[in-house]
Amino acid sequence: MTRGRLIGEVTEPHAPPVDTGEAVGSPVSRLTITLGYGPALFDHRFGLAARKPAALAQLPPLPNENLDPDYTGGDLCIQACSDDPLVAFHAVRNLARLGMGVVQHNWMELGFGRTSTTTTSQATPRNLLGFKDGTRNIKAEQTGRMDGYVWVGAETDQPWLRGGSYLVTRKIRTFVESWDRDYLQDQENIIGRGKVSGAPLSGGTEFTTPDFTARDSAGQPAIPADAHIRLASFEHNGGTRILRRGYSFTDGIDPQTGTLLGGLFFIAFMKNPAQFIRLQRALAGDALNEYVHHVGSAVFACPPGLRPGQYWGGGLFT
């Protein structure tokens, strides 16, 4: 599928088509597929307990969450990313179809409009709050940071995971209609950046390093003490960084209130889930918490990418 090919020939008239067909004729659109293993996969059912990474465990209770079981956990994770949502959906649909009778679908989310930059060539996108998101995210070209914060290395107790990463997902609902009624100055103080420019409130341009010691004309912190960028910064968290690759989402309209349902489908990769836990705990006092709420959560161990002749699970099951 990542090469734009059919799963199999669609020629037998008296059998279901091997490929569902909706992406026939579509370009590959930079399709990538990532596989992850959840903590529960390593329980007594499959004899994999001895191969469970020590760092892989269900996330502990964290601030500002009320998790819905319908969007939480899972034994396996499939993430398909593409410039064409149809191509991504085709990949997930056909992989799920192959697992019919063996796996049970737990939850699925369709994201749109990435919410962070991952390469230096990308312009910073905006989230549903209207702010630029991911300005200080790790970039793929920063190999030292990728090795230091994203890729699992020799520190793991499981050789099959070396070169892979841990994936954390959080479905974060945003109360967009309440946010839209807030004053611009309040919005900027909550985030810690200018809404249009993306520059930190301490001054400069979007990519100016925030000065968390700067004061405004009244002698108050230019970036408020509870601003999102302050509490989430690596300076505030002992140097902790993660690679964010999230998307916006919408679930339509709340049938009970008539309000818009949408928010951030947070996705991040890291060397150890403890990195995310530290950052999320630091956000307990985030001023943004008035407008967002975590309703889904999962963590997975993702093995490294495949080379020719390799297959998913090869390192884990052999």
What is the meaning of each model-derived region?
Residues M1-T318:
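Long, histidine/aromatic-enriched segments associated with O2/redox biology
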